[in-house]
Amino acid sequence: MSNVTPMMQQYLKIKSEYQDCLLFFRLGDFYEMFYEDAKEASRVLEITLTKRDAKKENPIPMCGVPYHSADSYIDTLVNNGYKVAICEQMEDPKQTKGMVRREVVRIVTPGTVMEQGGVDDKQNNYILSFVMNQPEIALSYCDVSTGELKVTHFNDEATLLNEITTINPNEVVINDNISDHLKRQINMVTETITVRETLSSEIYSVNQTEHKLMYQATQLLLDYIHHTQKRDLSHIEDAVQYAAIDYMKMDFYAKRNLELTESIRLKSKKGTLLWLMDETKTPMGARRLKQWIDRPLISKEQIEARLDIVDEFSAHFIERDTLRTYLNQVYDIERLVGRVSYGNVNARDLIQLKHSISEIPNIKALLNSMNQDTLVQVNQLEPLDDLLDILEQSLVEEPPISVKDGGLFKVGFNMQLDEYLEASKNGKTWLAELQAKERQRTGIKSLKISFNKVFGYFIEITRANLQNFEPSEFGYMRKQTLSNAERFITDELKEKEDIILGAEDKAIELEYQLFVQLREEVKKYTERLQHQAKIISELDCLQSFAEIAQKYNYTRPSFSENKTLELVESRHPVVERVMDYNDYVPNNCRLDNETFIYLITGPNMSGKSTYMRQVAIISIMAQMGAYVPCKEAVLPIFDQIFTRIGAADDLVSGKSTFMVEMLEAQKALTYATEDSLIIFDEIGRGTSTYDGLALAQAMIEYVAETSHAKTLFSTHYHELTTLDQALPSLKNVHVAANEYKGELIFLHKVKDGAVDDSYGIQVAKLADLPEKVISRAQVILSEFEASAGKKSSISNLKMVENEPEINQENSNLSVEETTDTLSQKDFEQASFDLFENDQESEIELQIKNLNLSNMTPIEALVKLSELQNQLK
């Protein structure tokens, strides 16, 4: 340390206190980074890495960014999961002898971003904490930008992971007793996990609760937020307690597979249920909509209350259109209030707040013309006329962005300010007169009087006009020489400059003081403004439901008392939107207490997965309180939805497709109740044919015998279709397809009964696989079918094993061994026959040479008849 300069000693001391952050160290007009921070920041920000003391033996790596444009660089780092500690100069270097005092004034983390450009308007930016005292777990989460703060508790890690998935925080704060295994699972949702080993001694204002663990979780969270932000956060609301069991439960897999808020392929909003339903007009409404999608209701009373309002908006489409116009003028009240409390609000933000609250009386008057018994929110809307008057009387309509450059307040708002502004204005009038006088006196028509912050006011004469010009004759004193001009000052101009700049400086200083006072006055309205924002966001969501209902021809769902699900002409809302409405084929679905399992067969690409997804999505929409894409819809209220759809390796945790499949199935089989909905799409395809078939059948039987959950189960194991003989609760349905002139035509219509062909080769043909591959596949398929003989389901194999005539060779085998032995022998024989070298008959040669992929069904029957006649 002896060779390190005092300034670098100061840097190293501060850095030692913020080891987990990149330190932005203020030096003049730049934020500098050194050592490993500089290497890391230069790589992520793609800026030049230089060296301090480059001529010394061990130069220090460094990089920097201008302070006036630092926000964009900070946003980039935070979006990449870094924390940034902002270290400012706490003294004016011009007025300080020796080292300037520096302090970290704020730590920007992924979960505490407050700047307008650093957060998505339509997304919450949550930070979450939890504490454990087995078996109890308490969880608290907050959006610092809006002030929302909630807390809950439960008794199992599965609910913890579900809640973290639902909340989708950008940062998680934990104490140091959390297992590494649990940390890895949390890392699947968020990259930023902060371990907070000890709490500060300060106790923050939290609603008192009898539940000690919830109090601790909230304290842990607020302590961390105050530690990083280091300023007033009075806009953070009192913690609101909620219970996870008050909402439909969907785990990470269900939300991903159903593409509720993020598409699987594009990882974006487009193509999701959120994308379809978002006809909101305010950022608050858009965030509320996402919350409602993530947490469908399970209270019939609450659902019906929302539906009643959607009814009202649907019936009054003219009023709804007017409401949308009013809402379009409302800015993000929640985040504007947050910035007021936080201290980074500017005058333009307050003008946005003024425009927003000026629409509240319009909205209230409009809703008063509708059914007030239904629209309970109308009584909670509060025109904030007193705040509106304050903002109207104080700020100009188009103030500058900076609050330290003046020009914020209207004339007449403050007498002292008016005097300063008048003096400045008169001075500038005098300057204009002086410029005209000097042009006449010198005869130089291009002479001008200008100003900059470095040199103040000056007279500028271009070099072309300086020939034969003697400055001293006119009392001009040279102030600055440029390549194409000279700048001068006179005693008279200097005297007036002091008066003008003195008035301007005093005006700017006074305006800033007045703005701080105005900000503190607005802060008093925080709670009332937050309540109005909540009401407006709910109205925005509900008018959005009515808008999409009218636009896409949706209907109001009803809820059955006997747990029946009956959808008439149902459609997948997202698929329907990206297609032509008239091209979409609607389908029915009926599940009740007697028949609660659909076994769905049909070709690949026929629409089995879409059909199952649409049942789940319609259920979610209904429990959000929205209309649904059906002609008629009667639904039970589901407590949970489980899905197993599509193939997805989990590379991060090293799980194979089949392992992921089994984990998703395990959750459904373990936690589903008779009030749950299960979507199983082709279970078992990630393993061998017979393992997969056995597992699929066992799962169907388990659901039928235990949970009785409503279940949609698609499969290509056609052996399973015989299960309806043993399971009265199971019904076979299929997605229809036809062959016409050798081409496969998907009808996308779900019909009763099973099909025994998946048309895999025809689908491959549609995908334009090489003709040689298609032809060879046809031959191999024919050989398999000929050698395999009569197909048997596993249930049939069980029955064979119980027959007294069973082959003695297998008499001592278990059911599983018998099944495996029979199946493997059949399979091996089928494979072996493909390579037999016995002399082929003429008929076999004819069959072998047939180009089946290019034959129509009629042509194939004619050829078959010819071959049959040859054998007679």
Swiss-Prot record:
Classification via Gene3D superfamilies: 1.10.1420.10, DNA repair protein MutS, domain I, MutS, connector domain, P-loop containing nucleotide triphosphate hydrolases
GO BP, one annotated term: mismatch repair
One Pfam family it belongs to: MutS_II
A single MF term (Gene Ontology): ATP-dependent DNA damage sensor activity
GO cellular component: cytosol
UniProt-annotated binding residues for ATP: 602-609
Coiled coil region boundaries: none
Domain of life of the organism encoding this protein: Bacteria
SMART domains: MUTSac (SM00534), MUTSd (SM00533)
InterPro entries, A to Z: DNA_mismatch_repair_MutS, DNA_mismatch_repair_MutS-lik_N, DNA_mismatch_repair_MutS/MSH, DNA_mismatch_repair_MutS_C, DNA_mismatch_repair_MutS_clamp, DNA_mismatch_repair_MutS_core, DNA_mismatch_repair_MutS_N, DNA_mismatch_repair_MutS_sf
Alphabetized UniProt keyword annotations: ATP-binding, DNA damage, DNA repair, DNA-binding, Nucleotide-binding
Transmembrane stretches, start-end: none
Role of this protein: This protein is involved in the repair of mismatches in DNA. It is possible that it carries out the mismatch recognition step. This protein has a weak ATPase activity.
Family (UniProt): Belongs to the DNA mismatch repair MutS family.
Name by which UniProt lists this protein: DNA mismatch repair protein MutS
Annotated source species: Staphylococcus aureus (strain MRSA252)
Organism ancestry: Bacteria, Bacillati, Bacillota, Bacilli, Bacillales
